[in-house]
Amino acid sequence: MDDPSMMPDLSHLSAEEREIIENVFKRQKDEEAKETQISQKASEELSELDKQITERKETSKKLVGTQDDAICQICQKTKFADGIGHKCFYCQLRSCARCGGRAQSKNKAIWACSLCQKRQQILAKTGKWFQPEEQPQPKISGSEPSPSPQPLTDDNVPEPQQRRAEPPDKMNTPNYQNNQQPRGMGMQPNHNQTQQNFMNQNQNSNQHPNQNHNQNQMQNPHQNQNHVQNNHQGANNHQQNNRRAMQQQPMSQNQANQINQMNQNQNQQQSHNQNMTQNQRNQTGPQNQQRTNDSRTMKQTPQQQPSQYQNNVGAAHQHHNQHGQQEQHHQQMNEQRTDNNRMRENTNGQGGMFNRQPSLEQTTPMNKYNHVEDDGMNQRPTFYTGNSENDQRQFDGQMQQGSQQNNQNQNQNNRNLRKNTVSRVTEEDYASSSNFESKKQRNNSSQSQSNTQGVRACPSTDDHLNRVKNRLHRQLRSMSSSEEDIIAGGGGNTLKMSTSAVVASGGKTAFHDDMGASNVQRLSEECNSEKDLLRYIYGDHKNSDSSSLGAGVGGSGGGGVLSGNSVLKSKSHALLKGSYQGGLDMQANRRRDKSLSLSPSRNDHFGTGSISGGDLLASRIRTFLSHPVTWQPSADQKKLIGHMILHRTENSAANGDLGLKIVGGRRTDTGKLGAFITQVKPGSVADTIGRLRPGDEVVEWNGQSLQNATYEQVYDSIAASRYDTSVELIVSRSAIIPGGDDFLNLTPSQMSSSAYSRVPSAYPSQFQRQLPNPDLFLDIHPALQQLSLPHSQSAVFPHNNTLTSRNRSTSSYYYSDVPDLGVPSNREMQESQAFGTGHIFGRIEVSFVYSHHDRQLSVALVRGFDLPPRSDGTPRNPYVKIFLLPDRSEKSRRQSAVIAETLMPVWDEVFYYNGLTEPMLLQRVLELTVWDYDKFGTNSFLGETLIDLASVPLDGEHSLMCILVDMDDDNPLRTVISIFKFHVIILTFLQRLKLRKASYNAPTRRPQSELNYYDHSSNYYDHISQNIDKQPHHHHLAPNDEENDEYIDDDELENDIDLATGGGARKSRTYRREKGMHGGHGYADWTQNHQRQSGYTSDHGYGRQNMIGRAYNRRQQRRPRSATALSQMEREDMYDPTRKHRDDNEYSMRESVRHGSQYYLGDQPLYEDGRYKISQGQMTPKQHNQQHQPHPLSQAHQQQQTAGVQPQHHQGFQQQQHPQQPNQQMQQMQPPMPNQGYYSDGSETLSVHSTNSMPTTMTTVNRRNMNANNTSNDNTSFAETPTANTNRVPIKETKQNSLASSSSVAGGGSAANNVMKERKKSLMTRFIPGRGAEGKRTGFARSEEVGIPGNLSSDRLTEPTPPFLKQASKESTDSAHSDKFARQCWLPVLADGPLGTFVDNLGPGQVVGRQVLASPVLGEIQIALMAGRSGIDVEIIKAKNLVVKPGVKVCPAPYVKVYLMEGKQCIAKAKTNAATKTTSPLFQQHLIFNDSPKKKTLQVTVLGDYGRMERKVFMGISQIRLEDLELGSQPLIGWYKLFHSSSLAGTGPVRKDSDVSVGGAQQ
């Protein structure tokens, strides 16, 4: 052996024996080396396999959104026809049979990919499968997480944390405590030395408080540790420590006396506590735990303390505060002393004000907040109080003692100021400390335990006082306190409070401002209720801006004068920016009040005596402010946000009982998940202190957000803090509380007088209703009002500003010389009307960079925040679509990647737009829409935001934009886009006419006064009229121009208009919302609607009135949100009986526009109100009739309207004075626009090229019907082929046809009915969209825009014809029919119905597609259907005449697979067993589906099994709509024809909230 230490002593053996043993050792070494080599090789293989698996997972993430359900995620080949693949048990990747297989794991069979199988074999072979590598154990274990970000080693772990790591029984032993003494004793000299150096530095350098601040911060943890240890020791130990400290550091005699006196006080206090609380000595474990927790919190103070105090106040403040803290310590220690002892001890304590040793055993309800401000600057003084002149002189002496080290002139002013307030201070503090604290001690001796832990139980002797006290306590804390914003963080939350100086004397209350002025108010005789107390405290001057009397007192930010606005708040650092002279005394008063409100529980009580009314009131106020509970209203005034710290009593610390039961994972009214309080134990801490109620939502628990947290996450968060001595809560409660407990006075009558109404009242309430992460304590001081706006306004008000100022100065062709585009001058009206009624869900972070040299705009999509989860709580698959409006073509479209299963997506993608000049850029608006990808259904719309590029920084600065759900079209940015598009439409239209016309007349300019009819509103109308008037292409078309050009190429015109407006109709989020208020006939002014309704479908009363008219607004409908469809209002509107007239009117006007009618947008004569005159000679009788049709908002004019066909004459017709008619005129002037139905996200945009390949089949079909009434035997007209050569239509012939069609439709047209019955089949065969057309596949339309042409619809015929079915197939996705044909189908999409009128002998409920006309029947199958309690019973009986695969002599073994479909989603599936090998098999097998037949479709597929050749050969398919059948307990038997899969009827997206579709009114 090479290593002699491994060899045993072989000297006593012979050489042969020694050789044998050495050979054994050698073989052992070889085996070990071989094993090591094998292990290393296995480890390398494992790491390589892990690397490959990781790469595969990353690759699979990129497949999201590409139909990955059918792709093997390992070989990335399409393997799963049914979308069902096996996932690996280990890596969760879907794999095919080549890339994976079944494996045995313990007692069950699993599916594992090949890599994972190999990995498991290696693990099992090397033994690592059951002997995993040892992980290093953390040195500190426990349920509480470490608050420090540093590694927890023995070197840097603070002593309290090291002590916490010890077992509790060890901490209870005296040896453990004694072992900890020397370390604390060693710290004492340094502590005293630091204090003396700190005093000298303050005397010498008054301009560098930060050095002192930092030095004291460094010493605070040691000092507090020392106090913790000293509290466990006797008087001798304390005196010994102090003697050592005095020996190491020379001190003055005054300081030495003070230290000795302090030790005596501590000994007396400890003896008193031990006598009163016997159980407390036996429960040191929980106390140690709390002390260590307190020390842990103290360790966070250097990072959490602001430096404003140090920057704004001199060193005299530090001495003053240290002195006050020392006095507070005396007050806590000296509970049973006489007045003389108190005076003497306090006098001795003057010199020792730098020895800050508050006992942590006796702190605190506000542990965190006390320690946050525990340095020299941020001490909270509690002045010693008494009722004698000695106390007052003593107080003055203390103040003088603390002030002699600073500027004498400043101290002289402060002393004069204090002389006016000393008596009130002493009486107030006497009342607060003596009356109630002594009463607590006398009535309930067990309360001392609660007090030591920071929990004050309510007095048991006065229930009414207890109730009033707590309610007023919350009121005062929310209205009188000056609260800092609560910064929620993982390491601990800090709250800095500055309570206004409220002091009472005799019956008076003084409010002191920074200059020392005071206003006195007398206490009324009847002060019985909390509202009386509030009136007494705050006075009746609710809206005083300069007086210090009001609903609250707060400091101004720099002026030094307090303002008294209701519920006013100010930051504590702003209080210190006033004048130094008044600031010192004001700071003293405020810190005194904070020490009273946040002071440690005081066990001291003074001698009894008579208490005046003012003292009683002051004591009540101080008691109410003693608990760390605050309530503030939210920004929208609808929620109360409570912040509190609940401390467990010793009895409840063991089992972690706070008296609360919280259940997480419940749905809130905003759709998010939340945690709610379900039970509150009476008499518990949560009941008596927190005043929590069942139904309150817990927003945060110990700094962890519970919003959007599942049940398990909430459970884990609460369980993690089970052994914490204190729990910090942020809860949310509805402001309108049952029982009238509106303790923040948020009723509507008082909201107007509060300061909150000043900020949000003028702003739209919908933007404050659902804030993603609302600042729980908004600072709305007048000087800081700009900071107090909810952050959602940032996504809105920049857009407002651009509408009023910025864009108007640009060199825009359309906006030049145009004032204030459509924005009313009244700001309040503007802000309340300019925005939609959408919810706010989440935010999105973007940045923009514009390169002037390259003319390139870069849009960086960074990340999203707080997206709403799905209804079942699962996360989303978000992606973003970007359009640079008003262009909505493919050229403008950008789309991000899909981030799987997250509510906080990170995209980090950059998109580029080239060729943008700066004037163009300033006119553009960027639209970001957020979608949820769903691979099984329709993608859900999550929200959108509009970004005006003229108002955002273009230098790469990141901006957070709020995502609005259902942003309405009355947003000013949408209006700008609409008007921009309108200009493009008009100009393109006029330019086309200019090219087609032979002669023009000179333009006639009208005076500007003619355009100012709508003085109340509409700059929109004026703006449109002005711009139309100013365009150089607006010439008057002479009457004889009609003769000059016989044809107008309507296809080119419409295509140009379509391209100009963005390449296609914009599919939108709802159906036809614009008629909710005005019935769809026309539009009133957009400012008429002042009341908005909340919710996703705010369909009642939309004030948006675009100039484009009804036809254009169909292009501007809203997107569907997921699968939601029409609201009730919209459904009723779809069945509006006036709709037929509107459609007729639109069609007639459309025909006139596209075939060269005389009226158009040129300089036609205007009425005095700016509307265009259209003579009757330019109108068809049908149009004239429709102008006078009744309409829902014009009942007063119904008697004036004409019926029937009017004779044709050339005089101006009487226009009704409806507010809608200007837009109705506009509507008639518009080119044809589509009436869009329901669209999925895939149909968001149309291809630019899709408009060029549309056939004008509608023109031919319409002309067929037009000629029907004139010549019933004119077969040549009906036999026209709908090809592209019909694009040009003679104008004269069209006019005649239009007249004939109108009269025939109005009169009933029996001849047309007969022709329709005869020609039905041939017409429908010719009416197949897309014939002879070429275009790229856009993959969206399916069958939604395929419907019955207008003249064939049953509502236009007196005898209804059977409704037709909109069909879908592969061809139906071609863009050849999707765009132009959709625009020409001005009627809505019809309901799905049977198409069996030309396909005979279909089974009951069977639906087929139009491809069955050219598809052979592949056989028949007999099916029996039943519906019972168990669901749907499908019996597959038998089949016949099945077609065998060509070229195969062997018959297959047929079997049937049945899919239960809801829309495009497969709900369930089942299959039969294979029958015998024949073409007429007999099955007789039942398949049961546990679902309702409502909205369901059965898809029956017959497959053939050819054995080893092919096991799944398609033999035919049939589709059955169960909703068309009346299923019952009796079986419904029928023979169903089998066709190819291309014959399936399109189902379209499921409309879950609409039982009847658009065409349901006809049935």
Swiss-Prot record:
**Tissue expression per record:** Restricted to discrete puncta in synapse-rich regions of the nervous system including the nerve ring, the ventral nerve cord and the dorsal nerve cord. Localized expression was found in the head.
Q: Which GO terms describe its molecular function?
A: small GTPase binding; structural constituent of presynaptic active zone; zinc ion binding
Q: Which organism is it from?
A: Caenorhabditis elegans
The record's Gene Ontology cellular component field reads:
axon; presynaptic active zone; presynaptic active zone cytoplasmic component; presynaptic membrane; synapse
List of residues binding Zn(2+) 1 = C72, C75, C96, C99
Q: Record's superkingdom? A: Eukaryota
Localization recorded for this chain is:
Synapse
Per UniProt, residues of the PDZ domain are: 643-733
Q: Where in the sequence does UniProt note compositional bias of the Basic and acidic residues kind? A: 25-35, 326-345, 1129-1154
**Zinc finger (FYVE-type) residue numbers:** 66-121
| The protein, known as | Rab-3-interacting molecule unc-10
